[in-house]
């Protein structure tokens, strides 16, 4: 209604989960990953509550453009009749903020370090532009990078002072008390392969 661009936190969570899972299907995810994001995929078991919460990301003064698209026949890849459409894009250089909250409940104490490692991997992926957001990412859209280093606050609910901080918590005034290096070790995904080579355009290339 206000004309702001919005990326829903639930959509960002799904992107992060897929990044952490790599090429695995949901049913093959490690148990600690299912516990972190919640599990409601196997109807024969009880659903589990998510332990990670991600804020909606707002771009308050979006610079929006339009691109043309055309729907293709699935197998022949020939353009279908009367199938032209437009889609909106956000131009490069625009900024948004993501807030991530991870809660380690008593029943998940055994997963504490795994949760921290997953969070460290998410932050590492953001800082090194390994994570893309939005549609048509295979065509080069949605690449993001971190403008400023993430700030991290860890609260211990067995300490009175941390409990009071939690009760009166304000994202705008909280003070970081740990670093990414102290948080955990990113769990490396083995599905990423980088190949660098020189190529020759043998025939005409349309760009």
Residue ranges and their predicted role:
Residues 1-207:
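Small/polar/charged residue-enriched interaction surfaces, especially the RNA/DNA-contacting tracks
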């Amino acid at each position: 209604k206000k004309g702001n661009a919005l990326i829903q936190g639930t959509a960002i969570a799904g992107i992060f989960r897929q990044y952490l899972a790599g090429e695995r299907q949901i049913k093959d995810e490690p148990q600690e990953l299912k516990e972190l994001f919640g599990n409601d995929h196997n109807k024969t078991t009880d659903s589990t509550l998510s332990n990670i919460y991600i804020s909606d990301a707002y771009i308050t003064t979006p610079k929006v453009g339009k691109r043309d698209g055309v729907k293709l026949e699935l197998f022949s890849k020939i353009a279908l009749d009367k199938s032209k459409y437009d889609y909106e894009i956000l131009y490069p250089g625009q900024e948004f903020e993501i807030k991530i909250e991870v809660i380690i409940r008593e029943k998940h104490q055994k997963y504490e370090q795994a949760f921290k490692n997953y969070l460290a991997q998410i932050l590492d992926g953001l800082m090194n532009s390994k994570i893309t957001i939005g549609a048509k990412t295979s065509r080069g859209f949605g690449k993001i990078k971190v403008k400023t280093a993430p700030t991290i606050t860890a609260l211990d609910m067995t300490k009175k002072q941390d409990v009071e901080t939690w009760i009166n918590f304000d994202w705008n005034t909280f003070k970081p008390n740990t670093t990414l290096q102290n948080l955990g070790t990113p769990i490396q995904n083995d599905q990423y392969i980088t190949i660098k080579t020189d190529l020759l355009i043998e025939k005409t290339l349309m760009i």
